[in-house]
Regions:
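General small-molecule cofactor/ligand-binding pocket signal
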Residues: 9-12, 46, 89, 185
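Short acidic low-complexity segments
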Residues: 7-20
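NAD(P)-binding Rossmann-fold cofactor-contacting core
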Residues: 1-6
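Phosphate-binding loop of NTP-binding sites
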Residues: 17-21, 28-169, 173-181
Length: 186
């Protein structure tokens, strides 16, 4: 029973209950310390963006990540698509929560994705993935810069061959060390 499961912070049957679910949709707001209690359920942990990709198959996705400039870039992409008469929705860390979007067939969904969301992603496969920049940020949450970088690069690692990775030219050293299936545009 979902209502009773999270009524208080000290649920005795939490482990038993979590063993009986397929997925745990983790809020990006949960701190690293709190997540340690869930580490044994790591394979079941997904994000709201993963849930979107699992439940909606008929949309084009554009996912934007980076330390700075995500919101502005998402708004610009959305504006350009709308100007060209495409059906566009925007969500994630910007505006409407991603799971509240009313996605229609053949829509473009522009998603602002944080490193927190990407760190646990397993099913996100954006048609177009943008990495704007990476600077020292959120290291308290990720533990170190390498973990932070890897969380950002995860969107490319999950892409397929027919999808596109768009990466800031200043980050090409990072990308040379990785083998992505998607088409890389620098």
């Amino acid at each position: 029973n979902q209502k009773n499961l999270f009524k208080n912070k000290r649920t005795k049957n939490l482990n038993k209950s979590l063993n009986n679910v397929d997925f745990i949709v983790l809020s990006p707001g949960i701190s690293f310390i709190e997540k340690k209690n869930l580490i044994k359920f790591k394979k079941k942990i997904i994000t709201d963006i993963d849930l979107l990709f699992l439940t909606n198959k008929h949309f084009k996705s554009i996912v934007v990540t980076g330390t700075n400039g995500k919101s502005t870039t998402c708004k610009l992409i959305s504006h350009l698509l709308k100007k060209n008469k495409f059906k566009v929705l925007i969500g994630g860390n910007i505006g409407t929560p991603i799971l509240d979007l009313k996605i229609k067939k053949d829509s473009y969904v522009v998603i602002e994705a944080s490193s927190f969301q990407l760190s646990h992603s397993k099913f996100i496969r954006p048609d177009y993935a943008f990495l704007l920049n990476i600077t020292n940020d959120h290291l308290d949450w990720h533990g170190n810069l390498l973990n932070y970088i890897n969380s950002k690069l995860k969107i490319f690692m999950l892409q397929k061959k027919n999808q596109f990775a768009l990466v800031n030219n200043k980050l090409k050293k990072i990308n040379k060390k990785r083998n992505f299936a998607s088409k890389l545009i620098i």
